[in-house]
Amino acid sequence: MHFTLFLYFDAIRHANQRRWCHECTIKIFRRSFDIARHTVHLCVRKIFSLHPLTETDFLPNELRSEEDQTLIGIFWFLPPIIEGEDERSRFPRRSMSENHLIITKKSLHNVASKDYIRGSHVPCFQPYEDVYELNIEE
């Protein structure tokens, strides 16, 4: 099975800086989201939307209360590219309750430990510079 997914990073920065720190984002990404040494909050932006979503929009209280269930992000499942199709039409425009998978520290580490995840920067979706593509094969 092969999935192509996009993960949106937001609010990744050093505690003493006001700018986004993409260098740290890449380091965190390559270290399978070992965020213990960073002051990090990850949330998801719905692509082509002006406002960020927060974890209170979709994360149940019982998950927020456990340290190993801290929200890491949402992976959007994307359909395959159809020749001649507008790239934007590939992205889901449904509610948050459909077509997504909530990823937590616990579940992501379980996946990463099996070496399923490899990533590459996807710079084409401005102004979303902090977008990464993940390919998961199993």
From Swiss-Prot:
Organism: Schizosaccharomyces pombe (strain 972 / ATCC 24843) (Fission yeast)
Protein name: Uncharacterized protein C13B11.02c
